[in-house]
């Protein structure tokens, strides 16, 4: 029996939302990402590496 990749508990209740493209590529990208997520009603936002570059991901959970 194979198990799929487990989702983070925060992802189950609170689907992540992406900020506008290239937000995290700017010098102050982390700040812009956090501000965008707060404005959208999330608790936290951070830049993560993806295959296509950095992406801003919003979450309701701290420390994810």
Curated annotation (Swiss-Prot):
It comes from the Eukaryota. Transmembrane segments: none annotated. Disulfide bonds join 10-61, 24-47, 33-56, 37-58. Residues 1-21 are annotated as: Disordered. Keywords: Antimicrobial, Disulfide bond, Fungicide, Plant defense. Belongs to the DEFL family. This is Defensin-like protein 41. It comes from Arabidopsis thaliana (Mouse-ear cress). The lineage of its organism: Eukaryota, Viridiplantae, Streptophyta, Embryophyta, Tracheophyta.
């Amino acid at each position: 029996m194979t198990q799929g990749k487990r989702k983070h508990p925060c992802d189950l209740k609170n689907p992540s939302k992406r900020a506008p493209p290239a937000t995290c590529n700017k010098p102050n990208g982390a700040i812009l990402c956090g501000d965008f997520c707060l404005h959208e009603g999330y608790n936290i936002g951070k830049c993560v590496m993806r295959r296509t570059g950095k992406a801003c991901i919003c979450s309701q959970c701290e420390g994810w």
